[in-house]
Amino acid sequence: MSTAICPCGSGNLLDACCGHYHAGHPAPCAEALMRSRYSAYVLGLIDYLVATTLPAQQAGLDRQSISNWSAQSTWLGLDVESSEVLGGQPEHAFVTFTARWHDGQGEHSHRERSSFVQNSGRWYFIDPTVQLKLGRNDACPCASGQKFKKCCAGYFGS
């Protein structure tokens, strides 16, 4: 058992916090998934970052860029401002946070309001940088069985 403190900022041990999700257990809520994804960046767990992105977007991720950013950054902290569960079927949520890191260009701070969707008992990050070619009447990429316009359309970046 690790005695390392979890990088997500909870103050808990990694094994009792985000490490539990990194080992394959589903995050119980969008905020827990977001915290575990931040910890995955800190720890270089690229497979986890890909696996927790909406499955329809995973092929569009640049694994090498994610790996480079993770490895070349010194992660300075995470502050969660709010977590908003919107309900519905499938369930959607927003998490607003600020992540801080240092790299070769200096210190950075990034504030984001991320979108998440739950399907089959698992939460997924909807990546606004990975565009999908979908019409409003196409099946939703979250696999809910609904039309895109009635499900996740409002949660994708414009």
Swiss-Prot record:
Pfam family, one: SEC-C
Domain of life where this protein originates: Bacteria
Family: Belongs to the UPF0225 family.
The protein, known as: UPF0225 protein Pfl01_1218
Organism: Pseudomonas fluorescens (strain Pf0-1)
